[in-house]
Amino acid sequence: LSIELEKSGALFVGDNAQGKTSILEAVCVLMRLSSPRAKRMQPMVKFDSDQGFGIAGEAEERALRVSFSRGKSVMFIDGEELKTQSEYLQSSGLVVWMGNEDVELVKGSGGVRRHYLDFLCSQIDPAYRVALSRYRRVLKARNLLLKDGGNRDQEVNAYGELLIEYGDLLGSVRERVVSDLLPKAAEVQLSISGSGVNEELGMEYVSGCGGDMRTALETTYESERRQRQTLAGPHRDEVKLLINGMAASDYASEGQQRTMALALKLAQGEILRERGERYPIYLLDDVFGELDATRRNALMNHLPEDSQKLITTTNVDWLSDDLGARLEIEKWSRFTVNEGGVSGG
C-alpha cells in the first residue's frame, strides 16, 4: 500500500473494520516506533511469521523506514541505518493519537492513564523511554523471583536497586508532566464547555510508592513475598481526574467525560509543540461519531492550523460547510477505504 498525503491533512472514509485504523497506526509506528494500541511491537508480528512487516514514509523532509520481525527492529533515516531507537526518534515526528476510546482516560483503569503518560513522556524525554523499557524488564524479572518463592532475597534486592534507579526517573518526569498538563487541559475544558458552565478540571499525580521508592520496597517486602509480586513503584502510579473537586469517573456525565478526554489530548499536543519545538501530527481515529456538534466544532477549532491532521470516519455528515471552510478541507487528500484497499487522493 502506498499513498501520498497533503501537508494540511487527509480524510479516510469507509465502513467499520475496513482497515482505516491500521493506516493511522502505521503512521504512528513510523513516527514513534510504537502503537497507541499496544505496549510492545512484537505482538503485532504474527506468531508463525518470519517476515514481519515494514513501513516507510517521508516526514520533516526526511525519508523514514522501519521494519519489525520477531525479536528485531531495523530503522533507517535518509537511507542510513541507525543503531538505536533513540537516534531514530530524535529525528522522526511527534504524534497525538485521538480515538473514540479516549473516554476511558477518564472512566477507565489507572493503566489507561499510565499508558497515556508513557506515550507523552517518551516523546518529550528520550531518557524516559529508555528508563521505561528497562523498568519493565527489571519488574518482570523481580516478579518471577518473587513467584519462585525460594530464598532469593539477595537477587530480589539487587533487582530492587534497579527498580529504584529507573523508577525514580519515571516518577519525577510523570509528576512534572502532570503539573504542566493541568493548566492547559483545564483551559481547553472551559473553552469546549462554553461560558457560564461550571466545569473545573483537576488532575493529581499519585505516586505508586508514596514518593520514596526505597522505603516503599522495604515496607512492602513481606507482603510481596506472600503475594509474590512487586507492590510498589511507577507501575502502580495513578492520575486522579476531578470535575469540580470530585472524582470524574464517578460524578462527571458522559459528555463531561468526553470533554475531559479531548482536553487531555489537546493539552498533550500543546506540550509536544512547546517541548519538541515543532507541531505534532494529529491522528484522529473515528472520533466524530461519538461527539455532539458543539464538541466536534470545538475539537477542530483547537487543532493547530499548521499541523497535519489525518482523520478516519465512516461518513462526512458531520463536516458542515462552515467547518469545511475553516479547515480548508478542499486542500486535503481524501481516500475511500474498503477491505484494506485505498482509492482516491
Feature-to-residue mapping (PLM):
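Conserved NTPase motor "head" modules and their coupling/switch loops across ABC/AAA+ ATPases, GTPases
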Residues: 1-15, 29, 151-281, 290-294, ...
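Conserved lysine of the Walker
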Residues: 20
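Nucleotide-state sensing region of NTPase/ATPase domains
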Residues: 28-112, 121-128, 182, 186-187, ...
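Structural motif
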Residues: 52, 93-95, 114, 236-238, ...
